[in-house]
């Protein structure tokens, strides 16, 4: 799953750069896609290991956490 997520993110960034989309929009899209992929993966893993009632909140939390971290990384803040 992580390899597929990385390939998807790279393809999306390449397509956005080739079409002339601004860098800030590309960065926001990158953060959103990374959060969706990691949140979905975490929700799936937690749902298999535990129950969907635990997996969905875990996926949402991980998605929000990754989105915030990627946005901070891109913006240069610590």
Swiss-Prot record:
The keyword Signal applies. Keywords: Signal. Residues 1-45 form the signal peptide. It comes from the Bacteria. The keyword Signal applies. To E.coli YkfL. This is Uncharacterized protein YpjK. The gene is ypjK.
């Amino acid at each position: 799953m992580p390899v597929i997520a990385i390939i998807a993110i790279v393809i999306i960034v390449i397509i956005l750069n080739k079409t002339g989309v601004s860098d800030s929009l590309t960065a926001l899209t990158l953060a959103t896609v990374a959060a969706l992929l990691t949140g979905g993966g975490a929700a799936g893993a937690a749902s298999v290991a535990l129950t969907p009632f635990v997996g969905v909140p875990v996926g949402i939390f991980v998605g929000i956490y990754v989105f915030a971290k990627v946005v901070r990384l891109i913006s240069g803040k610590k």
